[in-house]
Amino acid sequence: MTKLLEMKNITKKFGDVVALNNISISLETGEILSLCGENGSGKSTLMKVLCGIYPSGDYEGEIYFSGEKLTAKNIKDTEEKGISIIHQELTLVKNMSVLENMFLGNEITQAGITNDNKMYLRCKTLLEQVQLDIDPNTKVSALGLGQQQLVEIAKALNKQVRLLILDEPTASLTEKETDILLNLIKGLQAHNIACIYISHKLNEVKAISDKICVIRDGEHIGTQLAQGISEDDIITMMVGREITSLYPHEPHDIGKEILRVENLTAWHPTNTHIKRVDNANFILRKGEILGVAGLVGSGRTEMAQCIFGSYVGKYQGNIFLNNQKVKINKCAEAIANHIVMVPEDRKKHGIIPIMSVGKNITLSSLSQFCFGKKVINEPLEETIINQSIAKLKVKTSSPELAIGRLSGGNQQKAILAKCLLLHPNILILDEPTRGIDVGAKYEIYKLINQLAQEGMSIIVISSELPEVLGISDRVLVMHQGKVKADLINHHLTQEQVMEAALKE
């Protein structure tokens, strides 16, 4: 293989803050390099330097691509050289077709007129290359996230990409979609296309990479061959300390039944012939961590939403708290019964991005800080905010900072802080560590254990089986809306859980 990319002694500052400090990395033609590091470590900043988002002259150091010095003024310059980046937040225009997105700003023309036939055939060929069997005229809004990722890659191939950068590409994908994407990336190697792969999912990193590069606090910690480094080694390099177990599971007392769900059925919001939850029954005990496992679409989230009163469709069944039947038709009624839920999509349902960290934390519990019912006791609110930030270890320069500027892990910790101010007895966590770096995951796992030790009952819904098995006392297995198994987590394996989910 020949040298494709060299980044030499890259230093990037924002005022007096050094974001990147003398980082050097290299990449061969057709090689897959995974870039690992906690949120805020400098991974994205380094890629923005490479892609011309931070132009030449805005940083110190040199970049060479195919042996030539790269002096990009913007991202278009690097795209013309064959460097393409696909961000975690996809940039496709949802109300346009796949074809229109593919050639947006890059139309095939003849005598100044767009050649629709050539673009259609070219689009069809590119979609076949990424194993996507759809009509080019399909609206992007009609595609799933996995299909949209493949369209983004096809779009990059249309630009004659030689280096493809993927930032957290599988964060919102199903296991099947992830397998398709990883196989495609490996297949691109045969066409001498190199890849920089950014992910917190270390099993994927190990499976796909030729080399693994770790960045911490803007420093290059090291680059090693993937086959010569373990996941534990990567974690230690990322966080700067040894984590003996990613899933700290401290002993805690499990008490009497606190929640019982009987015959819970929920129908699709717009098609009542489809059951999202089908006659679900289970119990939850005081101080217990109950994991809920199952494939995407198994009804896990819908079941939790019914318990929390946030499900938008029709549902029926019985919910008992401390052996007393309760009616929960809206979130306020759940909160009044000391049930709180952290939603799956934190950006859409968990935070108000333009509001401050502090105001997001106290948003659901303002009545606790009021004189009478209308006037906020600001000194008391400020004290509670600072205590919550310290307790949850939310990393922020100020409580006044807009929460949208925090990393995913710190946003999630702020949401947890908000929920804990409601003093729940039952805490429901839906995908609590999705898109979060390994250090923040560890802190959230520790918090879950601490809360269980204090007597809180916790339901954890996760698509990551190692996570479910690592932190749960008991595992509820769901498939196609049904509770297929209720398993004590005594050395449970992933195979046992999947077998329980799929058995008839």
Swiss-Prot record:
It catalyses: D-xylose(out) + ATP + H2O = D-xylose(in) + ADP + phosphate + H(+). It comes from Histophilus somni (strain 129Pt) (Haemophilus somnus). It is an enzyme of class 7 (translocase). The keyword Cell membrane applies. The complex is composed of two ATP-binding proteins (XylG), two transmembrane proteins (XylH) and a solute-binding protein (XylF). Its EC number is 7.5.2.10. This is Xylose import ATP-binding protein XylG. It comes from the Bacteria. GO terms for molecular function: ABC-type D-xylose transporter activity; ATP binding; ATP hydrolysis activity. ATP binds at G37, E38, N39, G40, S41, G42, K43, S44. It is a peripheral membrane protein. InterPro entries: AAA+_ATPase, ABC_carbohydrate_import_ATPase, ABC_transporter-like_ATP-bd, ABC_transporter-like_CS, ABC_transptr_XylG, P-loop_NTPase. It is found in: Cell inner membrane. Keywords: ATP-binding, Cell inner membrane, Cell membrane, Membrane, Nucleotide-binding, Repeat, Sugar transport, Translocase, Transport.
